[in-house]
């Protein structure tokens, strides 16, 4: 029985075994992280990284782990839980197994994601892009993104670290094919 949680939930009752592994060449997108066990029957609490916490509810399987240490799990059930989710993964049947997943990244197959709208990007597509300012000076590469209270920030690492708000006032053209981001940002900011 699922924990008592308000609002939406999804159950895949036909899921009794893990899904077959997708090809290793499959690209995966980190969509959240397991923050804690939830209850004593193997449920986990998940902190989504997407704007809509319910986005992860649309996927029947998740890859959980970090780096080379990842495993794919079928999602037996998932529910909204405030700004987070609680989920039951096939094969995670008690609190100890759920606790072992604490802090692990939750990823989904990139091929299962809808294409982004115009002028919207998946964070994973921005990682590694070269950041140039309007004067043609290379500031570094996008190392990661982070949320601030007001907006997302590009974390750019080069000779020094730059935290650049990912908003139209500072970010000009994003050229995924060319591997660059143009910004209105001084080298010494």
Swiss-Prot record:
Residues covered by the PRC barrel domain: 118-189
Out of the domains of life, which is the source? Bacteria
Q: Does the keyword Chaperone apply?
A: yes
Give the matching Pfam families.
PRC_RimM, RimM
Q: Where along the chain is composition biased (Polar residues)?
A: 1-16
The GO annotation for biological process reads:
ribosomal small subunit biogenesis; rRNA processing
Q: Where in the cell is it found?
A: Cytoplasm
Provide the function of this protein: An accessory protein needed during the final step in the assembly of 30S ribosomal subunit, possibly for assembly of the head region. Essential for efficient processing of 16S rRNA. May be needed both before and after RbfA during the maturation of 16S rRNA. It has affinity for free ribosomal 30S subunits but not for 70S ribosomes.
* Record-stated family: Belongs to the RimM family.
- Describe the protein's quaternary organization and the partners it interacts with: Binds ribosomal protein uS19.
Q: What is known of its domains?
A: The PRC barrel domain binds ribosomal protein uS19.
Q: What is this protein called?
A: Ribosome maturation factor RimM
Species whose genome carries this gene: Thiobacillus denitrificans (strain ATCC 25259 / T1)
